[in-house]
C-alpha cells in the first residue's frame, strides 16, 4: 500500500486492521451492526472499513459527494451505530455539514420510523436469502440506541449513531479522534479479535451499498461476504490481475468499482494499492510514472483525459498493461488509442450494478477491439442473463429488452424495503436491472439504455446510449449525452449535450448535418447544446436528470 511517503507491507496492513477491529469491539460493535465510512480514498478508509468488517460489522460506505442531508439520510436509513468521517475534504467540513443536517427534524425525509426490535433481515422480498443479521441482533442494536432517545447521541436527529470517529488528529466535542478510537482497543486481546473474525459466516452480509439514486432516493443493496469474494475472484481472474501489479485506485472506495474491484481484488491477488483521493489528470500521470503503475480501471472519460492531455508525452506510461472500463459509452477509437498509442496489452469493458455485486458481464482478454467497444462482454461464470419483454419472456438474440440477471451475486434484497425488493427480484430469483440490452449470437451483451431514458420519436424507440455511441464517432466530439425533449409533431425528439475537443469550432448545425448522414432520421438530435463538461456521479454515469432540468 502506497500513500504519499507512507509505504506499508501486507503484514503491516494486517496489523493495523486488527487494531481497528479491536477498537470496534471495544466500542461495543456487535456482529450485524452497521458501521459507515464517509471519507475519500485513503489508507485510513481501508483500515477503518476492514477493521469494522473484521469485527463482524456490516459496512455502509457513504458517497464523498454527498451533502450533509444526503449522508444523514443513509445513516438514518441504515441505522448505523458508528461513523468514520474525514475532517475536511475539498474545502468542505464533512463534520460541520453533517452536524447541521442531523439537527433537522426526522420527519421530512420520507423514512418510516424503525422502532426497537425491528428485524434487520426480515421482509427483504421473495426469492432471496437472509438479510442483515438476525432479528435478535437488530433488536439489541436498536434497543441500545433507542434507550438514549432521539437527539441524545453525538448528533441530534441520529439516535442510533452512538459514536462518530473523525479520521484526523482533532475532533469536536462528543466526537472521537482516530488516535483515541484506536487506543480504546489496546486492551482487547488479539485472540478475541481473531475469534470474532473467524466466526463470520460466508452468508452473513458484508456491506450495504446504497445505489447512486440517479432516478430517486438511494436504496441499500445487501451483499454477503461469499458473494463479494466470489465475484472479485472471478473479476481478478478475467482481468488478469496478478501478484506484483501496481494498481492506481482512482475509482472511489464508496463505490463497488473502487472498494471491491480495487481493495478486495488487490488483497486477494497481492497487488500493491496506490489510492488517489481525487481524479486529477496531472496527478494521475505523475503517479503512473513515479509508482510504475500497471493497472488503471476507471470510466472512459478518465482514460480519454489521459490520452488527450498535452503533457502526456512528458510522462513514462510504459508500465501500464491493464485497463478495465465501463459505466458509460466506450468509443471504439478509445480502445484503439489505448492499445495503439499507450501500448496497453489488455483493455476490457464490463457491466454491473450494485444489486448484482457490481459485476454481471465482462469481456475476455483476446477479444477484438470491436467487441470490447460495442459490448460489455459475456456473462461471468455462474451467471445467467435473460433479455426479457414486457411480460418477462425471453427474447432472441438481436432483440432489445430489459436485462434480467440470475446467479450467485444477486443481492439478498434492499435493506428493509420488501416492496422495492419484490419489484426488483422475481419470485424465482431473477433481478430486473432496469437496463435495456441486446445479446449478440456470441452471448455478448450490449447495453442500449436505461428503460426510463428511452424516448419515442414518431413511434420509433430511440435509445440515447446508441445515439451517443454514434455521435462519439465524430472527430470533434470529446463527450456527449442525449436526452428526450418534447416535440409538438413527433412527441419527443433527441437533444444532445456535447463537449467539443480542444480547438474545435464545430457548430450545432454541423453536428446535426453530420448526424443526418450517419444515422437513421429518428435518431438524429434536433437540438445540440455545447457544454464544458457533463454532470456525472462518482461512478462516471451521466446525471441525465440534471440535463433534463436545464
Regions found by a protein language model. Name each.
Residues 157-161, 165-166, 171-210, 217, ...:
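Conserved pre-ATP/AMP-binding loop-to-beta segment of ANL
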Residues 14-19, 188, 202, 207, ...:
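Conserved structural elements of the adenylate-forming
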Residues 66-72, 83-85, 296, 407, ...:
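AMP-binding/adenylate-forming catalytic core of the ANL superfamily
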Residues 386, 397-411, 430, 436-437:
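AMP-binding/adenylate-forming core of the ANL superfamily
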Residues 229-246, 254-295, 309:
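Conserved AMP-binding/adenylation subdomain of ANL enzymes
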Residues 26-27, 57-180, 502-504:
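Structural core segment of the AMP-binding/adenylate-forming
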